[in-house]
Structures are given as C-alpha cells and as structure tokens.
C-alpha cells in the first residue's frame, strides 16, 4: 500500500469529501481514499476517526481528524465535525463517502458541473450496488430524489451549509434513517436541488434487502435487516411529516 506525503501550502480545493470511520480495515480505508485521490476535480479528503484511529492514515494525503471516543450514531457526529473542519478552512462544498465505499473518478466533477449549470445548493447522484467483494451488481433502483438519496450520493454547497447541523440534532433513533431525515430537511428548506442520474457512487452492500432487491441471495453471515420501521414510526409519533 503506497504512503502519500501531505503537501502543505497547496491551494485549498473547493470541495471536501468527508469520511467517518470506526473499525473498518486499512484496506477498505485505502480503497475509499484512493477513489478520492483519483477524482478529476480536486478534493480535500477529511477522514474522521470516531474513537478508533488508524495510525497509518496520518501519513496519507488527508486531513485526519481524531475524535477521543466513539459516538455510536452511525457516523453522524464525525460527519458533521469533518464538515465544519473543512468549511472553516474555506471549502465551498462538502460531499460524503462512507469508509467501505468508493467513487467513480468523475463523481465530484459531475455534481459540480450540475451545480454550475443549475445554481443548485444541494446535488445528488445515483449509486451502484456492489457485493462485499466489490463486484458490481447494478444501479440502485431505490434512489429517488423526492424520497431517498443515500448519504454517499449527497453534496451540500455553501448555500446549504446551514442544514448540516441536523446530522447531530436529529433524534437518537433517527441516525438509522439519517439520510432520509437529511433529505427531509433539505426539501423543507426550499433550497434549489439538482439530481444527476449517473450512478457514480459504488456502495458496498452489507444489508440483505439490497441483495434481494437485485435478485440475489444475501451472502452468508450478513447482519439481519435493521428495524427501520421503528425509526419511521417514532419520527411520525414525534409529529413529523412522513419521510
């Protein structure tokens, strides 16, 4: 695995990609990071350790933010802290990438071109569903800019930065459906949104339902489906609009 030296003094990229991580292997982190390095639009990669830092990451071309303990919120807190770190440095947009996923080289440039054309403050893409070994199953049929955008497919431009705090201020039961809650706040805010159909995010499937959605049997040992319904019900019980 190559070791990259950080290059202080270089111009700050306009876009940051924020990756929270917890106990993912160094190999997965490297695949994730390598895909950010390969973007054809310059990006700052911010890796945020949620209480379990990998020492080797400090030698990569990243901003490595280490939190002293884990937050147990499926990456929401490190996602927000990484975003605010990058915004404080002066970036004009933040995107998200989970530690076990990776990007097509044109992902960021495609979204930023869509922003330039439309003036949108929130951009989104499709995603490609992949098996645990990284092989591709096909485009995700669930992505719908009106109802569901995966976190990895989201880009917030500066006009949408005021919405990012919802990663942490959502109710504790909400982190399981955090991407739907964030899309709810985006749509409620009235900011201009633009969706790009290209499936430029590679999403490693760790949930049985996605395999069945694609007509495959889930691999042995994969965790049981989380209880999303309980979170949706509590969201409604709290007086919120359906997601």
Question: Residue ranges of each PLM-predicted region?
Answer:
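Catalytic beta-strand/loop signature of glycosyltransferases that borders the donor
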Residues: 124-126, 193-200
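Acidic donor-binding/catalytic loop of UDP-sugar-dependent glycosyltransferases
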Residues: 101-113
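N-proximal low-complexity "stem/linker" segments adjacent to membrane-targeting elements
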Residues: 1-34
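Short, acidic, metal-binding catalytic loop of nucleotide-sugar glycosyltransferases
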Residues: 31-43
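Short beta-strand-to-loop element that shapes/binds the nucleotide-sugar donor at the catalytic cleft/hinge
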Residues: 123-136
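Acidic donor-binding loop at a coil-to-helix junction in glycosyltransferase catalytic cores
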Residues: 173-182
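Short beta-strand-to-loop acidic/aromatic patch adjacent to the donor-nucleotide binding site
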Residues: 91-102
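Glycine-rich, basic loop-to-helix element that forms the pyrophosphate-binding segment
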Residues: 69-86
